[in-house]
Amino acid sequence: MGIRFRVTGAALALTALLAQAASAQDSPQDGKLILPTIDVSSSRLGAGIVGTSTSVITAEDIRRAPAQTLPDILSREPGIQVTNLFGGVNGARSAVDMRGFGAAAGSNTLILIDGRRITDLDLTGVDLASIPRESIERIEITRGNSGVVLYGDGAVGGVINIVTKSAAGSPPSARVETGFGSFKQREGAASAGGSNGPWSASLYGNGVNSDGYRVNNFYRQANGTGDFRYTVPDGSFYLKLSGDGQYIGLPGARRVDPVAGLDQLTTDRTGATTPYDHSQKDGANATAGITRLLAPGAELIVDGGIRYKREQAQFYNATATVATSDPNKAVDTMLTTTSFTPRVKLDSLFGTLPWNAIGGIDYYRAVYGSDRPLYLGAPPIDRYDLTQSSLGLYWQQTLSVLPSTDISAGGRIQRVTVSARDKFDINAPGGQQCFIDFGCFPANVEGLPFDTTETHRAFHLGLDQRFNENIAVFGRWAESFRVPNVDERVGVVTVGNGVPTTFDLRTQRSHDWEAGTRLHFGRLDIQSSIYDMMLTDEIHFRYGPNFEANNINLDPTRRYGNETIASYRVSDELRFKAGAAYTRSVFRQGLFAGNDVPLVSRWTGNAGVSWNIWQKWLVFDGVVRLVGSRRMDNDQTNVQPKIPASTTVDVRLGGEIEKIFWSFAIQNLLNVSYFDYAIASPYPYGPGSQLNTYNAYPLQGRSYMLKVGMTY
C-alpha cells in the first residue's frame, strides 16, 4: 500500500510550497455566482461526434453535486445505471452501465481519460474512485456504438471521456479540503498548479478512510495525479503521471431463503457473510506526448503510455475465525498495458464547405499474469498468462454541407492477437481435493493453449440538421464490437469440473441506430432520442443448475429505448434539471426469447434543483433519483423476485466566504432501505426449488458529509 500514501504525501507537500507563492483568484463581481449554462441547442463542427446523443458534466456540476461519488454523479444522466457491491463507499468498484448491459456493463462502457482508453482487459473494470474529483475539468458522455471508430472495441453502450484540468497559462493557485462523515469517514484533498512562461504543472491528491456501512466494509483509498507541460504556439510536450492505492473489506451478501426461514436483509442488514475477506489494489500510470502544428489546420499528436495494476484478494471459508484462518482461495494479478497512439487532426475547406477529420493508429499491448493460490504467498494452483495485442487504423471525417447541416462518416479496422496459457500445479496447497475412503483428486485441469488472430471492422454515419436557433434533429447508424476480456476467457468452463479451459469465446458484435431532437426555447433546453441496438454473440456469465458457472456467448439480444434530458433556467440563480430513460434489454432468440436481460431497470429518472440562495455565500442543490425494478443477476428465466424500485433524495448546502468554502450534504435523506445488486438462485424449479431465494448487497441508509477548505 506504500505507493498510494507516497503519492498523496507528495501532492500535499507541493501544495504547501506553491501556496506560499499563490495569488488569490478573482471573485465574481459583488459576490454574485451565476449558474453555468447547458448547451443542447446545436451541434458544432468539431464538437463531439455528429449525430450522437451527448451530454457534458462540468467541473461546477461535480463540485456542487450532493452525491459524493463519480458513479452517483454519472447516474443522474439519462440512460446510465449504476451497480454497487461494496456498500457504495466512495463509489469503489461500482459498475457504470450505459444502455442496459447489466452484469457485463464494465466491458460494454468505454472509459477514457483525456481521450485515451483506461478500460482494462479484465473484469475489474475502471475504478472511478481512483480519480481525484478536483482534477476533472468536465465529463463528456457519448451514447451508443459510434465511439468505437475513434476509441476502439468496447464502446458498445457508449463512451465516458473524463477531461482533466491543465495549468497552462494559469496563475499559481492551490486548494486544500478536508471532510468528515458518517461511518467514521474522513477525507482529505489538495491540489496546486500554475505556469511560468511556456512551462506549467498541476498536482492533485486525495485520500479517503471509512469504516463503511457494513461489517468488514472498511475502505482506504489514496490517489495522486500530476500534469506537466511545455506549451508554445505551434506545439506542446506533456507528461501525465498518476498513482492510486486501495484496500477494501469484502463483506459478502445478505441471504434471503424463505424455505430456511432466513432473511438477513431484515434481521442483520449490516452484517457480513465473509467477515475476513479483503482486497488490495495498486496502480501507476504514465503518459507522454507531443503536439505539433504542421500547417494551418493540420495538427499532429504523438503519444504513448504505460499502465500498471496489481490486485490481490484473499477469500476465506465460512468456518474462518480470527484465531484460525481457513483460506478458501486467493488471487494475485498483475496487468501491464502499453500503448502508442499517433494521430492527425485536420480542419480546412472543401471548396467553400468547412470540414474536419481525425485519423490515426492505435497500438495496445496488454500482458496479464494471475496466480490463483489457496492463500496469498503460497505456490499458485493455477497460473494464467495472457498477452493481447491490438493494432487499429481509423479515420473519421465531418463535412458541413450547409451552414445548418453536418454529416459525418468514419471507419475502423482493428487486428487483435491473443495468446493464453494455464499452468496447473497439483502439488500446490489446495491443488488436490481429498475425500475419506475415496482418495485424492486434482482440484482442476490444466487449460489448453490458445492462440488466435482476428480482424474486426466498425463504422459510423451521422447527421445533424439545425432548422433554426430553436430546433435541431440528429441521427446516426453504427457498428461496434467487443473482444472477450481475459477473465471471461479463463471462465469459459466451470472450475473444478474436470474439463480444461479453452479460453475461446467469440467476439461480440453490435449494430445500432439512433434519432433525436434538440430544442432550445428561451430558458428551456431539451434533448431527446430513441435508439435500437441488435447484438450477436453477447458475452455473459451463467450460473446454472448442476453447478455450472461459466462465460458463454448468448443467443441474439436487443436494446432499445428513449432518453430525455431537460433544463429550465428560471434565473441566473435558479435552475431545474430533469432526465428520464426507458431502457429495454431483451433476449430476441433462443431459450429465453422475449425475457429481460437481468440487472437492467426499464424506467429511470431524476429531477434536480440548483439555487443560489444568497449569492455565492449560500447555495443549495438537491436531487431526487428514481430507479425502477429490475431482474436479479442470473434470473434469465424471469421467475425470481425483482430488485425493488427505489427513490432516493440527496441534498447539499454550501457556500464561499472569500477564500473559505464549505458544504454539508445528506445522501439518502429519507433513509430508504434499498439495494441495486442481487443474484438469484439458479434452482427455481423442481424438487428442492429455491424460488424466492437470493443474495443481496444492501446499500447505506441516510448518511452525512461535512467538508471545509481554502483556496490560495
Residue map of PLM features:
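Gram-negative outer-membrane beta-barrel transporters
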Residues: L402-I407, R415, D525, I530-L535, ...
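C-terminal beta-signal and adjacent terminal beta-strands/loops
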Residues: L626-D635, G654-Y712
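Short acidic/polar hinge/loop motifs at secondary-structure boundaries
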Residues: R116-G144, I162-V163
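Membrane-embedded beta-barrel scaffold of Gram-negative outer-membrane proteins
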Residues: E299-N317, R466, A472-A478, R482-P484, ...
